[in-house]
């Protein structure tokens, strides 16, 4: 039983690591996107500032809840970038913008999958440490509940629009 709990806990850590990798990739893509967009809409520099602040906050965040909250804020910022760029037809034809948009869409899909996998393994782990007889072993060896990766803001539950082919 103990070995099974250790294995599940390691799977939770690995699944969280996969989320962090994809979220970091998105953080890395967005400044490139903002730089591409900035040439078309110079007066929107506050967006770049917001991204920089979120990246700093991400580096300092320690808990799943903190990182989940920052993910929500980043999604909102991304929606703003995409909404503002809608007003610039030349931008939508820019090959660099199109490429970044596709990379971002792929990353969003990977984030979604990673969240789902993480939450599935956390649910399995949390259930295992609560049911008999593994709950006895879990209590003896300090196996504690893990936090699900949840989106608090109902608006943020909507998919980020990254396709301008309409």
Task: Give the role of each language-model region.
Residues 1-166:
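A helix-centric hydrophobic-segment signal that preferentially recognizes long
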